[in-house]
């Protein structure tokens, strides 16, 4: 099993200067390769203390210069906020600088504050994502970009530096809609799962995706990658206490950043699932129930419990990759460092021994 590390640069409540958060998170990131992680990841967000990584490719380029062999992943780059030609150039340049170590993760975004900041209408996100992804992925395969869509208009231009190698087999999408699934499948794009839904819902979505992938390509879809907020300790009681404190605090920051406690997403095309959270959060006891549900989806406990929970995630999704988030929710840096190091020592070697699970070759939904 592929095992990665993700750093997310949170500064909840701005309790310290942002530059200190960067210094601390980079201490973690620079240990990823020596500790044996297969990849290092970060996620694009803007304008709040939720996640302060406005240019994930810039961070990964920095990490390319600090490392020799570890893969460099975006979890994710939010395509509707960008000119797709600039994204293609940044990805191609990162891949050349890193000798082909880039793993491209793409998404469409959910934060209203970010869409408004970039002057993009949220109801257009699904269409913009599909068009941008198609132009981007075709460009990275062909070495030139050209597109004539509803949202993306691009006369033919060459990508220089030319792409290092094909991105097929190392591209993932965190948002697959009915409209974009066929485009993604034809491009050979895998699924990147950030746990937030009940596993039966995730399984249903994956079944639909695998069916679409097979119909479009005649091939079996690649195994997904899963992220997870992780806390490990030799004491099961302490692990649970810290998980509920810090993963719970992270979930609070999710609610604040995405404004799930407001009803705007209920009437925004393409965000119906997210809009349902408003009703669940505002039901009697809803906030605590949602917090407990989210925390219980994540990966925490003793080394054996952490291993078992990754196994459960793997069995529910048939994933062949796990990216651990070890620092979040205001967790002290020393605790985050210990958390990461113990996971790398006590659990990661056993995860790497796991062989891929076989997905059913599904031809119909």
Put a short name on every predicted segment:
Residues 7-22, 77-84, 165-175, 231, ...:
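Active-site mouth loops of central-metabolism enzymes
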Residues 126-159, 200-319, 352-365:
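An alpha-helical appendage that flanks or caps ligand/catalytic pockets
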Residues 19-31, 90, 175-182, 305-312:
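Short, acidic/polar
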Residues 35, 97, 187, 316-317:
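Structural motif
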Residues 3-7, 40-42, 72-74, 102-106, ...:
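Hydrophobic faces of well-ordered beta-strands that scaffold small-molecule active sites
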Residues 83-190, 199-220, 362:
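Internal, glycine-rich beta/alpha segment that forms the wall or movable "lid"
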Residues 36, 44, 63, 94, ...:
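Conserved, mostly hydrophobic/aromatic
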Residues 1-72, 167-169, 361-365:
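N-terminal beta1-alpha1-beta2 module of alpha/beta enzyme domains
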